[in-house]
Amino acid sequence: MADTQYYGTGRRKSSTARVFLRAGSGNIVVNKRPLDEFFGRETARMIVRQPLELVEMTEKFDLYVTVAGGGISGQAGAIRHGITRALMEFDETLRPSLRKAGFVTRDARKVERKKVGLHKARKRPQFSKR
């Protein structure tokens, strides 16, 4: 652990990701498993790689990620947010390009709670006129 590492916490829905960025060759390890093994869906893998591809540093860093909570989509979004924060800690000049792509902003959308008297959060029971 002599080499420097950069850290970023990412959140999305109910998922939280801790991302450690170290100089390396582009290996991404999520919960002690390779990225391709952890995420079965290609879209999730693509979401995770987006910030690195934007700043053209895919082969420059090794990433060690721990992620907990939520599902596949939320975890992928949380990892992307964490990578973005770690990249900004590494080099603050990357912030404008990452902000323009929309990776810096925490996606605040959460599942809306179910209300009493309704079937779901907003779905009402069928209305009968007579």
Curated annotation (Swiss-Prot):
GO terms for molecular function: RNA binding; structural constituent of ribosome. One of its GO terms (biological process) is translation. Gene3D superfamilies: 3.30.230.10. InterPro entries: Ribosomal_Su5_D2-typ_SF, Ribosomal_uS9, Ribosomal_uS9_bac/plastid, Ribosomal_uS9_CS, Ribsml_uS5_D2-typ_fold_subgr. Keywords: Ribonucleoprotein, Ribosomal protein. One of its GO terms (cellular component) is cytosolic small ribosomal subunit. Belongs to the universal ribosomal protein uS9 family. This is Small ribosomal subunit protein uS9. The gene is rpsI.
